[in-house]
Amino acid sequence: MARAKRERPSLMDAEGTMAVMQIPGHDHQKPREVTLEEIRAVLGDCQLCPLGQTRTNLVFGVGNPHARVMFIGEGPGRNEDLQGEPFVGAAGQKLNSLLGLAGLRREDIYIANVIKCRPPSNRNPQPDEITACSPFLREQIRSIWPDVIVCLGNFATQFVLRTEMGVTKLRGQLYQTGHFTVMPTFHPAATIYHSDWLPLLENDMRMLGQWLADHPVQE
């Protein structure tokens, strides 16, 4: 007997506004009056995991310290490792081209990664590496205190939403976890090799833009 097809949650609620799925976790998070510069100073020449021995540069993060939208990726690639800044390679160029779909510019957002040092040969981050690095990402989030966190790819999605599910099952929907509205979507680099994912990523960026339009900053 064929399994009944599971209905995907509607993106609109009964009042016609964008629906957001509630996810437990982060409920007790509060913003911290600590600057990104202070967090970076604590990191210093971090050697908390073996990646500190193989990196060229620690890639902390870059962007607007008061951003409404924070993008979180997986980890630095070769270009990021060389330049010390996230999303400067092909994935960064792809991301820049997509931001306009959400009504955003690069200077509007903040970008960081789950880990801050490039894994050798761009392999996936190891659990101990994520464990060592994650407290600093949490402090960045609490310092910026964005309205929306955009998770690019599986590792960011699983870290923020505390799930083992992959982004392909979770994208296309907004999630609320504590203060934060979270949007999982594909990593821009993945669309370079999976061109059929690009329209889905574009749709997600439009969804982000709609949410921002529906939730303007209160003066």
Regions found by a protein language model. Give the residues of each.
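A polyanion-binding, active-site-adjacent surface
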Residues: A2-E219
